[in-house]
């Protein structure tokens, strides 16, 4: 069971409000976070109690509680990977343009296509990551079931919220609700940015920083409108 932080702050009723003075926990969450589209009623299963929940699920993909548990963790993990990926795509290009290093282009290296490692190394990495992902899936299905190290029995994790193991994975104690909200918001932006970088490179054959420089040099002509129109 994924433990979800819920708002417990009392919200005093407005003097102009009419009707029952009682307020539910969902009412507090909605007032605190708001909806992703003003005036649109959020689904009943998205009551604002989860971090980053603004009622966005137009296709009702998370209506099933088991699916919702999986999507919550997928949102966190994919956002973390996206933040690392965006940094890995952007920072080397910026440092190369600044003359501080000479990093190869992140998507296309000169000459024939190359890969980051040999086939045997890639296989070992794949097998290791598969093992880690299986353990993560087990923790989602049965929280706490993978806290004990299966090999070194003297090592174990303390009870924790799924997706937030703490200790060495959280040395600065970024666990309070505000930081979880920020992590999710930045992770979602990073996922969109990652997709944008790929599209830009596919259209222009250039990196995101170079595209930004060209836009700033001539903001009235180097835009998406000119790109779509073929000018």
UniProtKB/Swiss-Prot annotation:
Chlorophyll b 3 binds at residues 118, 133. Induction: By light. It is a single-pass membrane protein. It is found in: Plastid, Chloroplast thylakoid membrane. Chlorophyll a 5 binds at residues 182, 200. Photoregulated by reversible phosphorylation of its threonine residues. Chlorophyll b 4 binds at residue 136. The LHC complex consists of chlorophyll a-b binding proteins. This is Chlorophyll a-b binding protein 1B-20, chloroplastic. It comes from Hordeum vulgare.
């Amino acid at each position: 069971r994924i433990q979800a932080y819920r708002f417990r702050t009392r919200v005093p009723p407005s003097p102009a409000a009419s009707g029952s003075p009682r307020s539910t926990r969902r009412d507090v969450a909605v007032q605190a976070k708001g909806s992703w589209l003003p005036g649109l009623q959020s689904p009943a299963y998205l009551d604002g109690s989860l971090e980053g929940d603004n009622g966005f699920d137009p296709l009702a993909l998370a209506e099933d509680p088991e699916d919702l548990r999986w999507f919550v963790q997928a949102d966190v993990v994919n956002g973390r990977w996206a933040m690392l990926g965006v940094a890995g795509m952007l920072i080397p290009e910026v440092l190369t343009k600044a003359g501080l290093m000479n990093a190869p282009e992140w998507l296309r290296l000169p000459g024939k296509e190359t890969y980051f490692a040999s086939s045997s190394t890639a296989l070992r990495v794949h097998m290791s990551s598969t093992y880690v992902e299986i353990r993560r899936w087990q923790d989602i299905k049965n929280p706490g079931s993978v806290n004990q190290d299966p090999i070194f029995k003297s090592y174990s994790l303390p009870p924790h919220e799924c997706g937030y193991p703490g200790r060495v994975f959280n040395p600065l104690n970024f666990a309070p609700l505000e930081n979880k909200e920020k992590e999710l918001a930045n992770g979602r932006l990073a996922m969109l940015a990652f997709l944008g970088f790929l599209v830009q490179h596919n259209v222009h054959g250039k990196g995101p920083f170079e595209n930004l420089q060209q836009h700033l040099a001539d903001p009235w002509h180097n835009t998406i409108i000119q790109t779509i129109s073929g000018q």
